[in-house]
Amino acid sequence: MQSTYFQEATELWNQSLHNSLKVQDRRFSSEAWNSNPVAAFNAATYLLNARTLMGLADAVQGDAKTRNRIRFAVEQWVAAAAPSNFLAFNAEAQKKALDTKGESIAKGVQNLMHDIQQGHVSMTDESLFHVGKNVATTEGAVVFE
């Protein structure tokens, strides 16, 4: 696994020297990622590391339940660590900030302030949901699959 990682990392580096990196992942499908060599290298490096970490998780020996939990935890961590989740590394968000003269950043800060006031992150327009009309409440449990 180590030799494969170093071989792929070397290939990635060599491709970046010739500006021939093309990242094949929906999170990095915007032209902003591929037209910026630093962003493309960052995305490609992330994908290499993500594949390697998932490979390590798959290689864990043990019972199926433990292996599934490890895989799930690593998968969540890897997804959260994607450069598309951070403004400092997100080429598409940076381009939008430039194109909107910072308006997209201001809107994002407004959304953040609203979420802080609510005490949780909004994932959808909560005003569209009303208990008893289009949302039911029942007791339940979290199920790990």
Segments the model singles out, each with a brief description of its role:
Residues 1-145:
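Amphipathic, low-complexity, repeat-rich surface-exposed segments
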